[in-house]
């Protein structure tokens, strides 16, 4: 029954104390690893707070559900102050300023937040590889829960390539294909880094990426891939956006005057430097694939060789669209390479139109995803249905009495001034003013296209019609104008003023009034 002594019990007291204390520092060192991000939203929040030196608020943001950086950027003033109060930052305005500055940098230049998270332990959930545009919301990416077989490999391969990725994203590699060329798109990962990432980088095409060879000016070896490569990579616009740009360029180019050979020669003579750089393009054949590549290289508006752009700053969607539009214009008219002011104006016009059409289509697709028809179609169908129901009332035994009045003004007018004929018609048509429940227009159609305004109008019409029915029924029972119903003394004077009838009724009334006056005078005497 005696248990064997443990190995730690046989050790000296000093050594045993050391062994008992060693797990405590390890536990403290691994405690921050529990707060490392596990999803894309948490990773974006981690990097923004790390940029602002506010990582102490990270767990508070996660506990409050603030793992959406885009929500912080799009929040209004009151909503943003409420969020700051929830995370305990409202009483520290300097922290709020730093966070706002980091959010502005994240919105304008998400490439600065692409550095990997340091010290990722092997036992934690592996972080998937995200692109340089992790700050954008577009793109379907996994939530980081990989298969059990690749967890250890992904976590191990993340730390060794961190310095390489950081240097590669911030500055071009000295020995790479784009050495010395600041126009090479920053952050293009090497094949080795792609293999270590688990092949999850092709999840979606980010919106903030250079166009198909138009946003980036590559060298001769890289330009062929950018111009003729298949599929959309991280340095391209979306195919749908490119299609909108091409359609807008073709529409504008129909009414655009093209330059002639004499204009080309005169412009090249005036600018010798420009002639040395783009003069060979005008000598190339139109069917030469190299010509399109050269046009895309020298038609770039943003991100040129001679531009003073901050290193590592990515092009925005508007800039990429302008570059693509400029390339499309120059491929249709090569003389625009020499008229860059005019080219820039045309490209900006195309970018505005394409961005508007893209946002309009996105809103329509969003409404279709919610399950409802487009708003314009809904209004048209509701208007047509209400017009048809008003013009074509449902048939019945007495079709001249509609089931409901089409307007509120007619009901109020008919109730305000009624003649004798109106009373008689109301009394005679009382059964027809209450159609059977099947004919009531209160039942919604099967397709559910009734608008709220039409439903309220119908309910008001029904209420007015019921009130009119009650008032007419009461007047019919009390009116002396209707035969077989003797008048009552309490309603005589009011009703005789509204519907005077021929006969002895006025004389009787006057006689009764004179007799009442005589009796009153006799009682006074």
Swiss-Prot record:
Positions of the region NCD1?
Answer: 35-113
Q: Where in the cell is it found?
A: Nucleus
Q: Name one GO molecular function term.
A: transcription coregulator activity
Name of the protein this chain belongs to: NGFI-A-binding protein 2
Stretches of Basic and acidic residues bias are at 510-525
Q: Name one GO cellular component term.
A: nucleus
Q: Does the keyword Nucleus apply?
A: yes
């Amino acid at each position: 029954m005696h248990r064997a002594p443990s190995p730690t019990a046989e050790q000296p007291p000093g050594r045993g104390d050391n062994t008992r204390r060693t797990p405590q520092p390890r536990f403290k060192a691994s405690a921050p690893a529990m707060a490392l991000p596990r999803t894309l939203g948490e990773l974006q929040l981690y990097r923004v707070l790390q940029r602002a030196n506010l990582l102490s608020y990270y767990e508070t943001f996660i506990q409050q559900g603030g793992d959406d950086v885009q929500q912080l950027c799009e929040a209004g003033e009151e909503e943003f102050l409420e969020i700051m109060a929830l995370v305990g930052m409202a009483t520290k305005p300097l922290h709020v300023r730093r966070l706002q500055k980091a959010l502005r940098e994240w919105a304008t230049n998400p490439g600065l937040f692409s550095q990997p998270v340091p010290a990722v332990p092997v036992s934690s959930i592996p972080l998937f590889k995200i692109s340089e545009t992790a700050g954008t919301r577009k793109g379907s990416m996994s939530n980081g829960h990989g298969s059990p077989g690749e967890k250890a490999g992904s976590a191990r391969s993340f730390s060794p390539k961190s310095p390489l990725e950081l240097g590669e994203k911030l500055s071009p590699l000295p020995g790479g294909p784009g050495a010395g060329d600041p126009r090479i798109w920053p952050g293009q990962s090497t094949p080795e880094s792609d293999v270590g990432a688990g092949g999850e980088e092709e999840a979606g095409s980010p919106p903030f990426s250079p166009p198909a060879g138009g946003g980036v000016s590559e060298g001769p070896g890289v330009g062929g891939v950018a111009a003729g490569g298949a599929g959309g990579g991280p340095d391209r616009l979306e195919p749908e956006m490119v299609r909108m740009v091409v359609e807008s360029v073709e529409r504008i180019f129909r009414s655009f005057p093209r330059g002639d050979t004499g204009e080309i020669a005169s412009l090249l003579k005036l600018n010798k430097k420009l002639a040395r750089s783009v003069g060979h393009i005008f000598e190339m054949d139109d069917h030469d694939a190299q010509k399109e590549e050269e046009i895309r290289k020298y038609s770039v508006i943003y991100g040129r060789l001679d531009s003073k752009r901050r290193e590592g700053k990515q092009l925005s969607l508007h800039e990429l669209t302008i570059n693509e539009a400029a390339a499309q214009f120059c491929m249709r008219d090569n003389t625009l390479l020499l008229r860059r002011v005019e080219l820039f104006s045309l490209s900006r016009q195309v970018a505005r139109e394409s961005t508007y059409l893209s946002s309009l289509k996105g809103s329509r697709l969003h409404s279709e995803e919610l399950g409802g028809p487009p708003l314009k179609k809904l209004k048209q169908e509701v208007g047509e249905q209400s017009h048809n129901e008003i013009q074509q009332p449902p048939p019945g035994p007495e079709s001249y009495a509609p089931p409901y009045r089409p307007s509120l003004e007619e009901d109020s007018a008919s109730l305000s001034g009624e003649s004798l004929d109106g009373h008689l018609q109301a009394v005679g048509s009382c059964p027809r003013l209450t159609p059977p429940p099947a004919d009531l227009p209160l039942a919604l159609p099967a397709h559910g296209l009734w608008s709220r305004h039409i439903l309220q109008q119908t309910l008001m019409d029904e209420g007015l019609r019921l009130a009119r029915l009650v008032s007419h029924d009461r007047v019919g029972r009390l009116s002396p104008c209707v035969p077989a119903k003797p008048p009552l003394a309490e309603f005589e004077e009011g009703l005789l003023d509204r519907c005077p009838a021929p006969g002895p009724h006025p004389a009787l009334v006057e006689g009764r009034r004179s007799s009442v006056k005589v009796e009153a005078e006799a009682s006074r005497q």
